[in-house]
Curated annotation (Swiss-Prot):
One Pfam family hit: Lactamase_B_2
Cofactor note: Binds 2 Zn(2+) ions.
Catalytic activity from the UniProt record: Endonucleolytic cleavage of RNA, removing extra 3' nucleotides from tRNA precursor, generating 3' termini of tRNAs. A 3'-hydroxy group is left at the tRNA terminus and a 5'-phosphoryl group is left at the trailer molecule
SUPFAM superfamilies named among the record's database cross-references: Metallo-hydrolase/oxidoreductase (SSF56281)
Name recorded for this polypeptide: Ribonuclease Z
Natural source organism: Staphylococcus haemolyticus (strain JCSC1435)
Length: 306
């Protein structure tokens, strides 16, 4: 799996960074792509990447602020002409999302050539799709804002070739049956497939947060995440300001990483007051502290393998 950032700025775009948009490539579990938030200009950012809109079959919106949704109408209409014809799309997000999209399309006399299924969240939400389990929890941002927890499918254990050879079964087409079914038959005897496979490997857990100040529900979303994507609008000494505006300070994120046992944190939604040089300098200063957890400040077009 891969995650790519098409926008990493908070509130307003800058010369270096666009507003919020994240793409999650589900391979090898699926050939689909999921988008999380679609800030203004997202479709233009995607033109600089190999991602195709026709492969996007789910869009998740964290909240209804403009820097997270103003790119939606244009991206949806462009999808009609970029491989999305007749390919269903599911759009998930807070109440009002369907009205925003349909009103914009109606007033602009725009027409889509594919169906959209809308799912609007009210406080808490659980969704299952092709082995993935997605849950959404309400955060604290003044308006309804959600964090998404994505639990990937479990990968079956690898075949124990030596164990199969011990019963006289050598590499061949029968091995696919061992991989795919609970039981298999060999020379008149039925065997349990699990006895000839290594332990199953849990898929990665990814948590993606909308804008929020610290709140209890963050722990449920982030717990044991292999990758957590979190906002830190304020990364210097502006903690009171972060709290007043229902945002997170970098120290808040560090505390969550430790409490939730997060393996890796990718920090986005940085205030537009910071340029690339500022961010790198602050990062170097933070890395000098012994108790700083594993984190990265991300920039537009960064891609990370999960």
């Amino acid at each position: 799996m891969e995650v790519t950032f098409f926008g990493t700025s908070a509130g307003l775009p800058t010369k270096e960074r666009n507003t919020q948009a994240i793409a999650l490539n589900l391979e090898p579990f699926s050939n689909s792509i999921w988008l999380f938030d679609v800030g203004e200009g997202t479709q233009h950012q995607i033109l600089h990447h190999s991602i195709k809109l026709g492969k996007v079959d789910h869009i998740f919106i964290t909240h209804m602020h403009g820097d997270h949704i103003f790119g939606l109408p244009g991206l949806l209409t462009s999808r009609s002409f970029q491989g999305g014809e007749d390919k269903p799309l599911t759009v998930i997000g807070p109440r009002g999302l369907q009205q925003f999209i349909e009103t914009t399309l109606r007033l602009s006399e725009s027409h889509l050539n594919y169906p959209i299924t809308y799912i609007e969240i009210d406080n808490h939400f659980t969704y299952h799709h092709k082995g993935f389990s997605i849950s959404a929890h309400l955060l604290n941002h003044g308006i309804p804002s959600y964090g998404y927890r994505i639990e990937s499918p479990t990968t079956p254990g690898t075949i124990d070739v030596e164990a199969l050879k011990s019963i006289g079964l050598y590499p061949g087409p029968k091995y696919q049956e061992v991989k795919s079914y609970d039981n298999f038959e060999h020379e008149g005897q039925v065997y349990n497939s699990d006895d000839f496979k290594g332990p199953a490997k849990p898929g990665p857990i990814i948590s993606i947060f909308g804008d929020t100040k610290p709140c209890q529900s963050e722990l449920s979303i982030a717990k044991d995440s292999d990758v957590m994507i979190h906002e830190a609008t304020y990364i210097e000494g502006e903690k009171t300001l972060a709290n007043n505006y229902h945002h997170s300070h970098i120290e808040d994120v560090f505390e969550l990483i430790k409490q939730a046992n997060v393996k890796r944190c990718l920090i986005t939604h940085l205030s537009n007051r910071y340029n690339h040089e500022n961010i790198q300098l602050i990062k170097q200063q933070l890395k000098t502290h012994e108790d700083v957890p594993n984190f990265e400040f991300v920039k537009d077009f960064d891609t990370f393998i999960i």
